[in-house]
Amino acid sequence: MSNTTVVPSTAGPGPSGGPGGGGGGGGGGGGTEVIQVTNVSPSASSEQMRTLFGFLGKIDELRLFPPDDSPLPVSSRVCFVKFHDPDSAVVAQHLTNTVFVDRALIVVPYAEGVIPDEAKALSLLAPANAVAGLLPGGGLLPTPNPLTQIGAVPLAALGAPTLDPALAALGLPGANLNSQSLAADQLLKLMSTVDPKLNHVAAGLVSPSLKSDTSSKEIEEAMKRVREAQSLISAAIEPDKKEEKRRHSRSRSRSRRRRTPSSSRHRRSRSRSRRRSHSKSRSRRRSKSPRRRRSHSRERGRRSRSTSKTRDKKKEDKEKKRSKTPPKSYSTARRSRSASRERRRRRSRSGTRSPKKPRSPKRKLSRSPSPRRHKKEKKKDKDKERSRDERERSTSKKKKSKDKEKDRERKSESDKDVKQVTRDYDEEEQGYDSEKEKKEEKKPIETGSPKTKECSVEKGTGDSLRESKVNGDDHHEEDMDMSD
């Protein structure tokens, strides 16, 4: 009963509508019992196919190509099923696109009604070929006949008039160019005869890659010029600044030299001042006779006593004038200046009357060389030192015989010569070697012994002690003036 109920519902729209037979007489109207099942999975066996289609109706015969035991590798298989009832074959077509194992089945009625042999069956393996086994009006959409004669038509026959009759009516000439027969030079001639049409190209044919390199070079050159110009401008503006800096640095270094109590520098300054003063006095002394020296020294002693006070006043006035315009390194320079000048004054006064320590105070006190000594002051200092030396000699000459004094003078002069010759002005500027300094330190120690003899002899004068006290009071007053 299930067959009879299902068959009419399917037979009405399906095969009965196709062949044109009546609803009941669909089977007699040329229906077939054999179906062709393509796109069967290669892993499917004939037993599985039998079970699948056995639900639809009684199966007379079932064959699977290639068979299960075939050694050939198979992409897909073909199965032919012959039902006992042709209606069950119609129902089986509904299994089309049913996925079996891993593929969708294609079920088509086979027109011949007999299961074919293996060779023919394998030719129908492809789904497109499977359609060729259908009846001309059966089942699926009709397929047009294959165009076997396309390759036989020559290309020359496919001109413009043959393709479209409307083009032939326009009277256009046919194609007269055969690219195979034309040579390259002929093509060039042909192209030269044609009038050129100029159209602006939207995209650049040659990519401008070189532009970036050239532009970068130009930029670099321009930047170089800019840098050169900047350097020139700065060079034109800054030389004044550089000179100022140099001046500042020089003044600073000078002030530092004043501050630092390095013994080597003080030695240099002492030797310089001594050399200048003694060199002139020596030359004069050598030219003069001892008698003349004595008379001159007495006169000079008197003069120096009278004129020393006036000189001190002049110096104070000059210092006041200078203090109105203080330099940058004012405080340090002023201290050093005032101290050095006071020491000089003390020496000038006390050295004339109290010759207890003729040389030793000179070494200790005149350490800081005043940086801005004028030529006039230098000359005055030289005169003072000359007068001092001559006074010392005159006092000692009174108490000792002439012969002894001459010997001493020779000795002292020779010692001074040794001292002053050892030092060079240029060498002082460049910097002293440690060995020279050691030698020079030894020499003053050796030369100090004859001077101490003179000191012991010259202590006896009583009036010198009194006058030194008076001088001390004067120095206190001068110190007060300087501090003001």
Swiss-Prot record:
Keyword S-adenosyl-L-methionine tagged = no
What is its subcellular localisation?
Nucleus
Residue(s) of cross-link: Glycyl lysine isopeptide (Lys-Gly) (interchain with G-Cter in SUMO2):
197, 211
Composition bias (Basic residues) maps to 244-308, 334-379
One GO molecular function term of this record is: identical protein binding
InterPro entries named in the record = Nucleotide-bd_a/b_plait_sf, RBD_domain_sf, RRM_dom, RRM_SRSF11
Q: Which organism is it from?
A: Homo sapiens
sequence repeats at which positions?
Answer: 247-255, 258-265, 267-274, 275-282, 285-292, 293-300, 302-309, 321-328, 334-341, 346-353
Q: What is the protein's name according to its record?
A: Serine/arginine-rich splicing factor 11
List residues, modification Phosphothreonine.
Answer: 325, 447
Q: Where is this region: Disordered?
A: 1-33, 233-484
UniProt keywords (A-Z) are: Acetylation, Isopeptide bond, mRNA processing, mRNA splicing, Nucleus, Phosphoprotein, Repeat, RNA-binding, Ubl conjugation
Q: Which GO terms describe its biological process?
A: mRNA processing; RNA splicing
